[in-house]
Amino acid sequence: MSEELQPNQTPVQEDPKFGFNNYAEKLNGRAAMVGFLLILVIEYFTNQGVLAWLGLR
């Protein structure tokens, strides 16, 4: 009678759907790599840098 009841399962916690989670960080990193590659390709073919695109040079 003095025994404490213990759960027989460990609750499964889901990853948060917002904020800094593993999926969001991977997606952000991949998008950054693709964007950086596109900037390099555009600079190579146009012979102009980012500052020239923005009108700062």
Swiss-Prot record:
This is High light-inducible protein HliD. Induction: Transcription moderately up-regulated in low light (5 umol photons/m(2)/s) or heterotrophic growth, strongly induced in the absence of photosystem I (PSI), probably a monocistronic operon. Expressed at very low levels during growth under normal light (40 umol photons/m(2)/s), induced under high light (500 umol photons/m(2)/s for 6 hours) with maximal expression by 6-9 hours and decreasing after, and after growth at 4 degrees Celsius for 6 hours (at protein level). Upon return to normal light protein expression is stable for 3 hours, then decreases. Belongs to the Hlip family. Disruption phenotype: No visible growth effect of the single mutant; double hliC-hliD deletions are out-competed by wild-type in high light (500 umol photons/m(2)/s). Quadruple hliA-hliB-hliC-hliD deletions die rapidly in high light but grow normally in normal light (40 umol photons/m(2)/s). Quadruple mutants are sensitive to norflurazon. In an hliD-PSI-less mutant phycobilin, protochlorophyllide and protoheme levels are reduced. A single gene deletion red-shifts the chlorophyll/carotenoid ratio. It comes from Synechocystis sp. (strain ATCC 27184 / PCC 6803 / Kazusa). GO terms for cellular component: photosystem II; plasma membrane-derived thylakoid membrane. GO terms for molecular function: chlorophyll binding; pigment binding. Its main location: membrane. The gene is hliD.
